[in-house]
């Protein structure tokens, strides 16, 4: 069985009529930019556990569960467009990393969001 090296913490943020679940690893503060990990379609933030453990850095890392995935609530109608993901990301960063430089990494759909955001 896999032994987690860096346990995560969870928080929930009311955002655009949804309850967003965000997973956190590492210290609350770091001299390094916050690393923001964006998961792909049909995935969840917890899938980054292996990546976080492999990094072995004392760095603040956050990863949201996108709307309708993991522990984040979904919309009443299955309506998912990139404009919503970009707006959600903008507000998430305003809350968790206001005015900070960040390193933004995405996989699959999360990579598309990261590229469009940058």
Where would I find each of the regions flagged by the language model?
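Alpha/beta-hydrolase fold catalytic core
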Residues: 1-36, 56-59, 94-100
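Aromatic pocket-lining residues of Rossmann-like dinucleotide-binding sites
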Residues: 55, 117-118
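Pocket-edge positions in alpha/beta enzyme catalytic cores
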Residues: 12-14, 40, 77, 81
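Active-site loop/oxyanion-hole signature of alpha/beta-hydrolase fold enzymes
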Residues: 18, 66-105
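Active-site signature of alpha/beta-hydrolase-fold catalytic machinery across serine-
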Residues: 50, 116-117
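Conserved HGGG/HGGXW glycine-rich cap/lid loop of the alpha/beta-hydrolase fold
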Residues: 21, 25-74
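Gly/Ala-rich beta-loop-alpha elbow adjacent to hydrolase catalytic centers
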Residues: 106, 110, 114
């Amino acid at each position: 069985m896999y032994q987690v090296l860096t346990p995560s913490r969870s928080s929930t943020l009311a955002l655009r009529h949804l309850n967003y679940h965000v997973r956190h690893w590492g210290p609350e503060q770091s001299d390094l930019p916050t690393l923001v990990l964006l998961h792909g379609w049909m995935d969840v933030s917890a899938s980054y556990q292996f990546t976080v453990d492999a990094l072995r850095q004392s760095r603040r890392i956050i990863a949201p569960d996108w709307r309708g995935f993991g522990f984040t609530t979904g919309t009443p109608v299955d309506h998912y467009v990139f404009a919503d993901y970009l707006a959600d990301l903008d507000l998430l960063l305003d809350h968790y990393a206001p005015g900070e430089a960040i390193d933004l990494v995405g996989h699959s759909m999360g990579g598309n969001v990261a590229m469009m955001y940058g």
